[in-house]
């Protein structure tokens, strides 16, 4: 299996399966001198973890990070950082009935067609368990970005089924299990998810990520576009079926006079571009959004085929999320941060000595944003 590494100057490789003995990652290219301790990973891993809410999978993993290399006396050395998390709460017997069946909407069929073999236990390599290591690597990237450039990357749930936020406050997001930006709606979300779980069905969601403080100039034209690499990174997350940058697909119905982000000495008057023009950061907040499909792991019967091509009925047992989007904000944050750190290192390598050619336009006066 190839394509387990992404990034150029900052390269991240993940390994391991959902029900294997461990999962891990190697971060290559992190500059030396960054203070790093194993306990720093706990916060974001808890945010991503299952079993902390009745609205997510009941699987409970300790997610304790072991730093195997790349850190000496509490600081990164510039050599590859190897991180390991041991799996402790696998329940492989739940998957005994689907060893020879293909679950509709899962990677069972495509992995079988590509490799001629698959690990049916929890989805193996295709499981969202792999994203644990993305979040772990993202902790390193977010810390480096904040310390070096003051960049802050934050995510939130922007839609659950047909429900959208009726207000927005960053302070509310970490105070509920949905990463929801409007506290008054949380009881309604709880009731919605309780009913969904009882029905045995699942639902999709949208997640938004905002990166603030990104300097103008990060990114590359044509084949190394910042928005292109963000889109690729976010599309690599399990269940993601769409990515928007700024106004995204809403741009299709806008007039040019609506979409263009006018500039004044005080800053940009809007941010429909989502902070990126020509593949290069403008200095405004970078705004991205992803759509996640409903999980196909359902206890409702459905038609499928087995490895012999025979028609069968499938019912997925085990512990599964009724909405995978609920745990996705920390994962999306991590992918955005890793792309930004890689782009920052590449920009510094090529254009670190380039001075300002013209006055740098401030972020803007906040009259309009990509969601208007």
Curated annotation (Swiss-Prot):
Q: Which residues bind FMN?
A: 125-127, 238-239, 278, 293-297, 319
The cofactor remark states: Reduced FMN (FMNH(2)).
Does the UniProt entry include the keyword Flavoprotein? yes
Gene Ontology cellular-component terms for this entry are:
cytosol
InterPro entries, per database record: Chorismate_synth, Chorismate_synth_AroC_sf, Chorismate_synthase_CS
Q: Which cofactor does it need?
A: FMNH2
Physiological role: This reaction introduces a second double bond into the aromatic ring system.
Q: What is this protein called?
A: Chorismate synthase
